[in-house]
């Protein structure tokens, strides 16, 4: 099995459009939501350039989808990249016959984001837009003696765990692998 050494992915010119029916506060966080979701999944829905450096030998598959490979090069004994043709593998990747390293240049992304991915973007944006009940605090207790007691707590890392806590991660599970 070939080993991915490096992945250099450029930023897209734009992210997919925001789902309809969002408040202005939530819509303002759609780009941020896409920026958090894309590293979490192996699929891209807007085109951008990517370069992979791979060490062989063995079979290798692009880790991002959809991918259109435009060039494959190998590092030569002359200390420069030279164009090379590699055979297709039986499982849809590439067979790298030598150690290399190889450089794959591609464009990834395209198509329309499925409804479930758009829902994940919406859930994450809504979660991030929610105002914390207790700014700077991890717990708050309100008590009216003899009438009521209310205690609310929130872990300090609630924003860091937004992907999981919002439910977006569960929706994105099928898109984690290429």
Regions picked out by a protein language model, each given a short descriptive name:
Residues 13, 17-20, 58, 63-67, ...:
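Generic low-complexity segments that are intrinsically disordered, proline-rich and/or Lys/Arg-biased
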Residues 90-118:
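Surface-exposed interaction regions enriched in Ser/Thr/Asp/Glu
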Residues 38, 77, 109, 130:
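Residue-level marker of positions within ordered structural domains that often coincide
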Residues 2-6, 112-178:
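Short loop/turn elements at secondary-structure junctions
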Residues 1-76:
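Glycine-enriched, solvent-exposed interface loops adjoining structured elements
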Residues 74-99:
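Extracellular/luminal ectodomains and secreted, surface-exposed scaffolds of diverse proteins
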């Amino acid at each position: 099995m070939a080993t991915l050494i490096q992945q250099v992915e450029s930023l897209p010119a734009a992210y997919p459009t925001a789902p309809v029916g969002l408040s202005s506060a939530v819509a303002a966080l759609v780009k941020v939501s896409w920026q958090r979701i894309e590293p979490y999944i192996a699929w891209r829905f807007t085109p951008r350039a990517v370069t992979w450096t791979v060490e062989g030998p063995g079979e290798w598959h692009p880790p991002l989808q959809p991918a259109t490979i435009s060039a494959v090069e190998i590092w030569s004994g002359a200390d420069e990249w030279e164009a090379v043709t590699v055979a297709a593998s039986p499982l849809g990747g590439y067979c790298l016959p030598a150690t290399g390293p190889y450089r794959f240049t591609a464009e990834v992304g395209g198509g329309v984001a499925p409804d479930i991915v758009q829902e994940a973007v919406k859930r994450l944006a809504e979660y991030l837009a929610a105002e914390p009940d207790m700014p700077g605090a991890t717990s708050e207790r309100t008590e009216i003696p003899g009438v009521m007691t209310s205690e609310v707590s929130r872990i300090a890392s609630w924003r860091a765990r937004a992907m999981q806590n919002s439910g977006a991660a569960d929706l994105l599970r099928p898109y984690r692998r290429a």
